[in-house]
Amino acid sequence: MKKFILIIGILSLISSSNAATITGGVEYTTTDARLELQNNRPTSADFILYGNNYIDAKRDENISALLKGVTKLNDRTLAQFSDDTYGIIYNNDPKHVWYYSNDGTLIYAEEKASLKYPYRTYKYTPDGELVNMTMRVSESETFIFDTLGKLLGHWVGQNCYDESGNIVMTRKISK
């Protein structure tokens, strides 16, 4: 009986040392996130929605707002990235994120599996090619993997880190 209790104690210490505790007690390691994404991968994207979003019709208004530091507008939320791209989430379509180049051309469309954390997202090119998969653990933490499951980045707050812990991109977050 003592051996059993000792083994259970050691196993619980080992497993908890390999995971990060997130708000609400949800734990995800890089491996957990990778497996969740690969095991639930969609077969295709819903491209009916993409047609109206190939060009950002409100590009000038969006860029102007971002230059002023405004990210929340009446019908949408904006995000600005350090590589001169930006993203839009429309209030009436919160399960999609549209990513545009600085000239307002669609470069990626992302589909969310849910709106409750933790949830999966899958990012596609306008031609429908899967680019990456993410596991949104919380509002401030996201794991990003390529289509083969290699970790591309780990967002924590405003910074995205590579596997070595180097900052590879930043973003502005509004509260």
Identify the residue ranges that each predicted region occupies.
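Sec-dependent N-terminal signal peptides
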Residues: 4-16
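Repetitive, compositionally biased segments used for assembly/scaffolding
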Residues: 21-175
